[in-house]
A protein has these predicted regions:
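Bacterial Sec-dependent N-terminal signal peptides
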Residues: 1-23
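N-terminal accessory beta-strand-rich subdomains and adjacent acidic, glycine-rich linkers
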Residues: 25-248
Length: 248
């Protein structure tokens, strides 16, 4: 699950679609974080806190293909047709054996959009963060080829960026996911370099937005690069699907 964690404040999701887009809203448990989702030709989201824009409309999507047929494309998040919307509130906790606390509270409001094409998109609004994930309802296995995850900001904010600096044998996706942080405006991010997560953006009023992943099963998979058009945001980059697997 992709997450945008905000320190000391809440978030709002807004998905700006196109003509005839369907719109849905979600609020955090304390009411300070509101989420608005527009689903149309594209699926985008926007986040705000207490009158402050945190994230401008940013596209999310997933591209794949049938496991046995390379010509059969599978796309989530394009030309979205929502069949129904489901909502629920959760107040629970989960154990954290390697953390300073024995358990952590898990309190959020959730919106799940069931979409035509065999998938759902799930949004969560926490008091201190927001997240989304795609859920496949395909009856056959498929291969994920790429994912769209944009994070667009309204200004050229200062950011703390953990660049990849250990390209083993020239392979930019082979990395230990450990790095020092460079501090610079978003517009000054290197266009030819990948960043790992978490990446922190310093917003107005002393607020901080942290982009990261959650719910990972094996290893971090999302890298980030500067948006070459706006220079005021970042885009996700993922290691390509391997054509051949060898034991290294």
């Amino acid at each position: 699950m992709k997450s945008l964690l905000i320190q000391t404040f809440c978030l709002l999701f807004l998905c700006l679609g196109t003509v005839r887009a369907q719109q849905y809203q979600l609020a955090s448990p304390n009411g300070k974080l509101s989420v608005t989702v527009d689903a149309g030709e594209a699926l985008t989201w926007q986040i705000a806190h207490d009158g402050t824009t945190v994230l401008q409309p940013s596209a999310i999507a997933l591209q794949g293909r049938d496991e046995k047929s390379a010509k059969k494309a599978i796309t989530f998040g394009k030309n979205v047709k929502v069949i129904r919307a489901e909502r629920k509130s959760v107040e629970s906790s989960f154990p954290t054996p390697l953390y300073k606390k024995a358990s952590v509270k898990d309190v959020y409001n959730q919106l799940t959009l069931k979409c035509r094409g065999g998938y759902s998109v799930q949004f969560r609004a926490y008091d201190d963060g927001a997240a989304y994930r795609f859920i496949s309802e395909q009856n056959k296995p498929f291969i994920v080829l790429n994912e769209t995850a944009d994070f667009n900001f309204d200004k050229d904010y200062q950011a703390f960026v953990p660049y990849i600096n250990d390209n083993r044998n020239g392979e930019r996706y082979c990395f230990s996911f450990e790095s020092y942080y460079d501090e610079a405006p978003l517009s000054k991010m290197y266009t030819d370099s990948l960043s790992i997560t978490p990446l922190m953006v310093c917003l107005d009023g002393g607020k901080k937005a942290v982009i990261m992943e959650a719910g990972l099963e094996n290893y971090p998979g999302m890298f980030l690069t500067v948006n070459p058009q706006t220079r005021q945001g970042v885009q996700a980059a993922f290691a390509p699907y391997p054509l051949e697997e060898i034991i290294g």
